[in-house]
Amino acid sequence: MKKIAILGSTGSIGTQTLSVIEEHADDFEVTALACGNNIRLLEEQMRKFRPKLVAVWSKEAAASLRVRTADLGIPVETGMDGLLAVATYEESEILVTAIVGMLGIRPTIAAIKAKKTIALANKETLVTAGHLIIPLAAEYGVSILPVDSEHSAIFQSLQGNEENPISKILLTASGGPFRGRKKQDLLHIQVEDALKHPNWSMGHKVTIDSSTLVNKGLEVMEAKWLFGVELEQIEVVVHPQSVIHSAVEYEDGAVIAQLGTPDMRLPIQYALYYPKRKHLSGKRLDLFALCDLTFERPDTDTFRGLSLAYDAARRGGNI
């Protein structure tokens, strides 16, 4: 039985991770959970999964949660100290980093030093501190398993070919809700329009960033660090159907890709069970039902966030 801790348990990735764990309750135990301040949902998770430690960000939320869950006897920590306690909880084997932003850097570093396997959904950790995280993981012999669907697809496409040089990574993008529009078409869009992703169910920040291709730019940086490739070896391909989640082209011209339905539980479960696979409920990919698979070059004139991300990655450093 693998023992799992989750940073960001009440967010999109966190709740889907717990869904996978619930489906395979005989294989996993939840040891520690952390969230922002959504104590109502965290309380539900505490009562269902019975972790041995939880953390919330604010002292006020923690005080309220302690009262609400006094009958459980589960310690409630706060702030960065709480995140670090969850990240390094002694009994945990895998840490799922599903919080948003640079807040994930310190807990990830601490977890690596505590020799926890990292299931990485917090791309900002590598975007801003990949030059620290990757060498540190190598030093401590810690695996970093990608949870982002695209990076999981690349990771899976590399299995069994680790010694074979690659030509390039084909990083797919759906194009978001505004694919095909030009600058003048985007002057009066509303937040609710940007939150209507055509294929994926994700948190609000990632969904907004996907609508501008900024998220894809961050994924380019993440791929650079995860797979040790040059920026010139990462090619973004707009693939509106989101069936091919990404691919790797090898030096001989062969392309190996990972296909599947747009369900984040797939890469989550792959990371939790790695290197094994296990049955997962849900819709299967039906090749006969697919009308077509199409591919386009990204419109970097309209969606400048992607080209800006490449420029930032070339310069390196932080602002």
What are the functions of these language-model segments?
Residues 1-319:
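Catalytic, metal-anchored helix/loop core of enzyme active sites in primary metabolism
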